[in-house]
């Protein structure tokens, strides 16, 4: 009887030992997986930092391009308005040689007319 009970205790001890070995192996695998996960998370953190810097640089570059574009468009609009203004001034303002000689001719004609 003592031999049977001793064998049963030995068998239970062997089962517990096997379970403990399996658990220890699983703990080691878990540690390896956690280390890999930590490494990947560090890589993702570095990549996100790089991505953030890249997007900020790109946003700043696009902002300056937009400012340059608006300045160019503004200069073109001002240039076109100046050309239109110059054309209108030339067309609608009488020229000094034509305007000064035309009234003198009329005044001279009136003064030397038949009534004098």
Curated annotation (Swiss-Prot):
Q: Which UniProt keywords apply?
A: Cell membrane, Coiled coil, Developmental protein, Differentiation, Golgi apparatus, Membrane, Myogenesis, Phosphoprotein, Transmembrane, Transmembrane helix
Q: Where is this region: Disordered?
A: 96-116
* Post-translational note: (Microbial infection) Targeted and hydrolyzed by C.botulinum neurotoxin type X (BoNT/X) which hydrolyzes the 40-Arg-|-Ser-41 bond and probably inhibits neurotransmitter release. It remains unknown whether BoNT/X is ever produced, or what organisms it targets.
Modified sites of kind Phosphoserine: 41, 48-49
Please give the chief subcellular localization of this protein. membrane
**Known function:** May participate in trafficking events that are associated with myogenesis, such as myoblast fusion and/or GLUT4 trafficking.
Which protein, by its recorded name, is this?
A: Vesicle-associated membrane protein 5
According to the record, the signal peptide region is none
InterPro entries in the record: Synaptobrevin-like, V_SNARE_CC, Vamp5, VAMP5_R-SNARE
Q: How does it sit in the membrane?
A: Single-pass type IV membrane protein
Site feature: (Microbial infection) Cleavage: 40-41
- The chain positions of domain v-SNARE coiled-coil homology read 5-65
Parts of the chain on the Cytoplasmic side:
1-72
May I have one GO cellular component term?
A: extracellular exosome
What residue ranges are annotated as transmembrane? 73-93
Q: Which family does it belong to?
A: Belongs to the synaptobrevin family.
Induction info: During myogenesis.
> Which stretches face the Vesicular side?
94-116
Pfam family example for this protein?
Answer: Synaptobrevin
Compartments, as annotated in UniProt:
Cell membrane; Endomembrane system; Golgi apparatus, trans-Golgi network membrane
